[in-house]
Amino acid sequence: MNHFIFFHGVGIRSHFWNIIVPKLKERSIEYSLVDLDFSSLDNAFESSLKSVKEIMKEYPDRSFIIVGHSLGGLFAIYVAQQLGDIIHKLIFVNTGLAPKRVAMKAMQQMQINRLSKLIKKIGMRMLFSGKLPKWLTRSLYFTDDTPEAIKIELSKHKVRESREFLMEHFNSKSIWNSHLERIHFSGPDNVLSVFGSKDKTTPKRAFMYLIKKLNASYTIYEGSGHNDIITAQKY
């Protein structure tokens, strides 16, 4: 029997997955919703691995599929690399990672410089600390495909992450890449990745980098935003 384990992203906890719980129950799918500890990056790593091990211990006869959205996708990848073939499948949704080093030509093409990076970090820190207006944050995460009622409901459960955790997160590229130096869980039959073409927070190139790194199968949903694949009936 398959058992799905769901990891959330930044600024929300397991409430994010409540929208699909009725479908899981309707199809008699076994699942667990995990609240990751975002008090620090180290605690997040520890809680992701510990939670999965505890669920496995509780249900020893099941095949486990880890599903992660956004940053939760990176933690799902981390757990899969740590546990290897004990994991049955890995699915990550709208998750990306930049390589350690980017060639100068690519840097020029992407028009990245120190100033733009600083502005982005400030903007993202304001976003996840709850200092941006709702109309702006919703447009970053959703398209019109997600009903307004669902957007409002999720906004009730948003979490203001600490500045310390956010700064750790924004400066963690080398840490994540170091965890992927040796791949222990990969391949198109084992790893599925899903992306929305209108995602405004995760660059497509960062998503494709993970696809290549994990030799994963993937699907891109045209017109979908960062959250829509989960929150919109259309997908």
State what each model feature region is.
Residues 68-72, 76:
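Gly/Ala-rich beta-loop-alpha elbow adjacent to hydrolase catalytic centers
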Residues 224-234:
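Catalytic histidine-centered segment of alpha/beta-hydrolase-like enzymes
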Residues 127-170:
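Conserved alpha/beta-hydrolase catalytic His-Asp/Glu region
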Residues 2-41:
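Conserved HGGG/HGGXW glycine-rich cap/lid loop of the alpha/beta-hydrolase fold
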Residues 33-64:
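Active-site loop/oxyanion-hole signature of alpha/beta-hydrolase fold enzymes
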Residues 200-206:
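Conserved alpha/beta-hydrolase "acid-adjacent" motif
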Residues 90-122, 165, 171-172:
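Flexible "cap/lid" loop of the alpha/beta hydrolase fold
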Residues 187, 193-195:
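Short beta-strand/loop motif that positions the catalytic acidic residue
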